[in-house]
Design a protein with these regions (language model features):
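N-terminal amphipathic/basic-hydrophobic helices that include classical n-h-c signal peptides
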Residues: 1-32
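Accessory interaction regions appended to the cores of large information-processing enzymes
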Residues: 20, 25-211
């Protein structure tokens, strides 16, 4: 269970031992449960039509899957493994807003499809990285992720970059939007199971083969 300090105040304290119990008023930090007290999961997809209106922009679609959790949780273990276990075609990289300025909470990105060419790699390490990083920091700035918890949280973000992606501005903007929405969903524990049960039979997936 994770805790975080709030404002200082007076509480009644009872300390027991083999010799008895002492009770009295002491000035200590009050503690309340952390907002992010366990591993949370978030997902979001952003897609629009191609600029020439020929259909959905499947080349530049952003689909984010992420986990966020506190120090000591499986999220920290996953963060360390993702960052250090590099393989050909599958790589982990820290989310940074600029060189020498990694985001807080510490965030590692990984590609969900094999990187097949240099352009795709640059898109992952450029516009996608910037979009994810800015989304994380904006979630801290707007209070979605409490600032006082940020130093002790870890985020792992799966990013989809198609090998035919051709509009870097969309990669950056859509991965920003998808990451921000996924984080908000995770922290809010959305969607609720009752909502999924109510809607899933009538739902439509943009890439489904059939209804």
């Amino acid at each position: 269970m994770a805790w975080r300090p709030t404002d200082a105040g007076f509480l009644v304290c009872c300390l027991s031992s083999n010799t008895g119990c002492f009770c009295g008023n002491v000035d200590i930090w009050r503690f309340e449960m952390a907002v992010i007290d366990r591993v949370l999961v978030g997902e979001a997809l952003v897609i629009e039509e191609r600029p020439d209106h020929t259909g959905l922009d499947l080349y530049n679609v952003a689909h984010i899957d992420l986990i966020i959790g506190p120090r000591g949780s499986a999220a920290e273990d996953a963060f360390c493994r993702t960052l250090t276990d590099q393989k050909q075609g599958v790589n982990g990289l820290l989310a940074i807003v600029a060189p020498n300025m990694m985001v807080k909470p510490a965030t590692v990105m990984f590609n969900k499809v094999t990187i097949k060419n240099g352009r795709q790699a640059v898109q992952m390490f450029g516009p996608a990285q910037r979009g994810v990083a800015m989304a994380v920091m904006d979630c801290v700035a707007d209070g979605t992720i409490p600032q006082e918890e940020a130093e002790n949280l870890f985020i792992c973000v799966g990013v989809f970059i198609d090998s035919h992606a051709d509009i870097d501005e969309r990669i950056q903007d859509w991965n920003y939007r998808a990451t921000k929405q996924a984080l908000k969903n995770a922290v809010a524990r959305e969607p609720k199971v009752a909502d999924v049960l109510k809607a899933y039979k009538d739902s439509v997936h943009p890439f489904q083969a059939k209804k």
